[in-house]
Every structure is written in structure tokens, then in C-alpha cells.
């Protein structure tokens, strides 16, 4: 996985001086115990740092300002162990710019029935302390995640861990750089968009680079580096017999290795973590990048075909949310309309990430009917099975919309021996008919990010943090209700942006 900086999450406990120093010491002790125990659990991808028990408006504001200034702090987790009058939190919450999670828990799991007294009641007040704090968040319209349950509960910890990855995706979003090689595919609408608006909203720096610059980087690759990479290919993947001996097939694979190394060097030199290509802008290149793109995606880079920079950035961020696992650029390619067994076959010309593979990928070389270049090498495989999501980010002109469809990937019942690309088969929820109708009504793109590892909840959380609309198509969706949701969202987001 493409390296991330060592992020951390600050744990801040709310209380007040009303209860005396002894109670505050107990509150701090309990808070430290929780943080220490959470840090022992490998489910968490990043560390927790206990900052303090805050008891005054000044302390609260200061810790929020410190969080804003810290490059390591990816989010703030708050918990009211006792009652903490929420007017104290106004100044701090007005300043806070980092993702916020409200953990509604308490130190003890069970009520000590035989020994409970008023001392215990005064100390363990999160049941109503967190409600007071929750009110001020609602009153101020603060975007925050609320997780409820005992801090030792595995489900609570799993939700915390996924939110941490989403918060880190937000941090990465604020510094994400996308390199565009060539422009968008000509006359295509949905891959266009407002790059300035995207940088303001998401933080993305999206810039174009001449294919000639990439070609020079490819030419600079040494033969020794190519040979070493070919050895790696032979170890990781199956390969057609002709690919293991001198000849045109071997040379095609060799060219993709050269492209991979040159492309990676260009991205590393510019600190890019996402990129696009297009088959219409390949001057000076022998092949459309195929195998090269697939392998870079597997390392954690975001990618979008035909100049689709929004999907490239989304793939990168979902890779972060997924820790690099089971996530790929995707396209709804063709339908299977068998009654009672409607399916969608997802694929692309070449560029599907092997992290979603169910079978050992095989390097093959086949003609590509568009682009006018030599036959490109690519990885061919069937995708895995299981629950997944397809996500699309579109530009509506006055705002962005994130569209999520929950799907179930299935194992193909038939071989596809003549299909020379990686592919995956899925059943969309609630059905192909209703999901496609809702998707089209929402303006969802034909390009998506497909993921086994990212959840709908994570994508909703990301949209909440970043401040964009998110609509979900799942087993509960009815088209009539979905159309109403789109209408209501138009009013809500228009008012939020001052357009109504």
C-alpha cells in the first residue's frame, strides 16, 4: 500500500470542576485505561493519543486549535465521562477543522447492582452527559460521527477503526495530487468537471501533463530494472507460454514493464497518488498502459480511464479507506437479463485492479481495437465473490454528488475463454432494474470505484466530513422514494450553499 504518514487520533474527555479533584483524577485514569487498551487492539490502523480531561471553555478551544495545527492528528474523538456543560464546547467546536467522532460509551459495561451508590452515579454520567454534548453539536450543525456502545465491544471497535480510515482518507484528500496524461475522452460529458471547485471542496490538485513528458520518463528506464520487474511478474502471475520466450509477446510484456517503471517514477517525482490516461492521447507511446496501470493500482494509486480525474481521486481515497485491499477502478460494461438472475458484468478495456481477483492473474497479450497502438499486455482474471459497493462521484455544476450502490459479487457459472480482460460479475441491490433506474436518475457515471473492503457507512461518513451530498441505492431502495430524496436534496443543498 502506498505509504501514509503516521497519523494519530486524539482522545479528549469532557468533564467539569463541579465534582472535585478526586473525581477528575478518576475520569483521567479511566480515559487513559481506555486509550491504552484500544491501542493494544490490532484492529485499529492508527494510534490513539490521550490529550486531556477538559473542564473549561479555554481548555476545549486550545485542544481544538492544537488539533488543527497538528499534521499527525487525523481526527478528534470526544467522550463525556461526566456531565460537561455544552456551552463550554461552543468556542472549540467553532474552531475545529479535523474530523470529529463522538464516542457515546461509559467506562463500566455493567451496573454494579449490589454496590451502586451516588458516588458511582456522579462519576459515570455519560448517559446524560453525552446527550448534553450531542445537543450542542446539533444546535451548531457540526458534522460529526456518533458511535454508541461499550468501548470493549468488538462491533464498536470495528466501527471506530473504519471511521479512522475514513478520517485519514479526508486528510489524504486535502493533499491529493492527480496527474492527467492527455485530456478527457472527446465529447464525453460525465468525466468533465470543475477542477477549481474540486480543489476547494476536496483539496485535490488536478493538473495535466504532456504525454511527451511521460514518454521521456519511460525512455529513461534501465534495462536492468525492466529485467528485474519481469522476474517479479513471473513469480506473481501466470503467463502465456509465448511470454516466457523471446518474441513479440515477450516484447509486449516487456514494454508494459517499461511503462510501469517510467510511470511510477513520474508519479513519485511529483508526489502524485492518482493519475489518468486516455487512449486518444498516446503520441510517442507504443501501447496503452494496461498491466502497468493494474499493478500501480494494486500498490494504492488511484486511476481513472479516459481522463476521468474524479474517479481516479475517488479510487485513491477508497484505497486508503480499504487499506489497499479489494478495491478497483470499474465500469458497468454489459448486462445479463436472464429473468430472475439479472447480472452486471463489470470490466474495462484493460485497467482492473488485481486486488479484487478470485483467481491467480494471468498475463496475456491481445489486440486492442481502439487507440491505434501495439497489442498491450494485461492481467486477466475473474473477480471474487461477496458484498461490495460501487461508488461514483459526479459534478452537477453547482455541487458534487456521491452515489453508492450496494452489490453482491457472484462467481460466474460459465467460463469466458474469449474475453481478454479482467472482469467481475455482480447482482446490484435491490435489483438490476431498480438500481439502474435509480443510478441513471441520480446521474451516476459509467465509471465507478468497486470495493469489497469499503462500506457504505464509510462513504457516507466521508461525504459528511467533506460536505457533499451522498445518495445510497440498496435493498431498501424504491425508485419513487429515491426520486423524492433527490428532489429534497436539491432543496437542502441549494439552501446550504445559499442558492435558495
Curated annotation (Swiss-Prot):
Cellular component, GO annotation: cytosol
Principal EC category: isomerase
EC identifiers of the protein: 5.3.1.4
Catalysed reactions listed for this entry: beta-L-arabinopyranose = L-ribulose
CDD domains assigned to the protein according to its UniProt record, in alphabetical order: L-arabinose_isomerase
GO biological processes: L-arabinose catabolic process to xylulose 5-phosphate
One function term, GO molecular function aspect: manganese ion binding
Residues annotated to bind Mn(2+): 306, 331, 348, 447
One Pfam family here: AraA_central
This protein's pathway: Carbohydrate degradation; L-arabinose degradation via L-ribulose; D-xylulose 5-phosphate from L-arabinose (bacterial route): step 1/3
Cofactors, names only: Mn(2+)
Key words, A-Z: Arabinose catabolism, Carbohydrate metabolism, Isomerase, Manganese, Metal-binding
Manner of cofactor binding, per the entry note: Binds 1 Mn(2+) ion per subunit.
PANTHER family registered for this protein in UniProt: L-ARABINOSE ISOMERASE (PTHR38464:SF1)
Role noted for this protein: Catalyzes the conversion of L-arabinose to L-ribulose.
NCBIfam families named among the record's database cross-references: PRK02929.1
UniProt record similarity statement: Belongs to the arabinose isomerase family.
Protein name: L-arabinose isomerase
Organism of this sequence: Anoxybacillus flavithermus (strain DSM 21510 / WK1)
